[in-house]
Amino acid sequence: MIADKLFEKVEKNGVVCVGLDTSLDYIPEEFKSKFSNESDMLFAFNKEIIDATLDVSACFKVQIAYYEALGLKGLEAYKNTLSYLREKNALIIADIKRGDIAATAKMYAKAHFEGDFESDFITLNPYMGMDSIDPYLPYIEKNEKGVFVLVRTSNKGAEDIEYLEAGHGKKVYDVVGEKLNTLGKNYLGKHGYSSIGGVVGCTHQEEAKEMRDKLDTMPFLIPGYGAQGGTAKDVAAYLKNGNGGIVNSSRKILLAYKAMEDNKNFAECARKEAISMRDSIREAILK
């Protein structure tokens, strides 16, 4: 199961998930000047970041919107980035947040679990119901693939829907998490985690222990670290024995060179930030 590969990557490299949410204005001007087109520029920047952080991260999350916004040349950079990650045997999360059902969802599954855009995991939105997850299950069962489904997110607007009362003392996010955790038990790996994971923001620490205990076999994709205010202490509460999830950081890693005032060595700065993040979380876990 792909869940086992993720667990083992975390054991080896730590919990950091490097977010390749690469906006053109994140790229240093002097690096940009080497390229005549945006596709090559984006891919080359990503490649530098990947090479610098590969051995200090569990996986890479590539947010497709940053590439779609540039049209075909952006999608070419997206394709090339995924291809390079596969070449490096890195685990890939395609952050696509699809949420349709039936035949449309089958096409999304085919698009992102096969071919040019093949990834190991994708993100999904469960708002239309559990039948929006069903078309991805054959890939989970037979093709070593996995999904991370939105459960309780880190944005302020999450309270508009995810926190609504659903009866019996539960909120909407509780019900979503429980349904996914139950389904996920059909796809458990040898380390006790499922290939059906949940996106759980780390900006609500007061709920962390309860969620970790209830969603016992669900690996968490944890956004909100760094730029959104989440700390190492916040993150540690969502993990179990230092595993059971990965922690995404995009801007804080990609833009580390600005904080370190070293545009020329942006990739090395990204590596330093990833190591610092990994070590801070490890220290918080031990406390």
UniProtKB/Swiss-Prot annotation:
Underlying gene: pyrF
Entry keyword Lyase: yes
SMART domains: OMPdecase
Positions of disulphide bridges: none
Gene Ontology terms for molecular function: orotidine-5'-phosphate decarboxylase activity
Species this protein is from: Clostridium perfringens (strain 13 / Type A)
Pathway: Pyrimidine metabolism; UMP biosynthesis via de novo pathway; UMP from orotate: step 2/2
Source taxon at top rank: Bacteria
UniProt-listed Enzyme Commission number(s): 4.1.1.23
Name the UniProt record assigns to this protein: Orotidine 5'-phosphate decarboxylase
Similarity remark: Belongs to the OMP decarboxylase family. Type 2 subfamily.
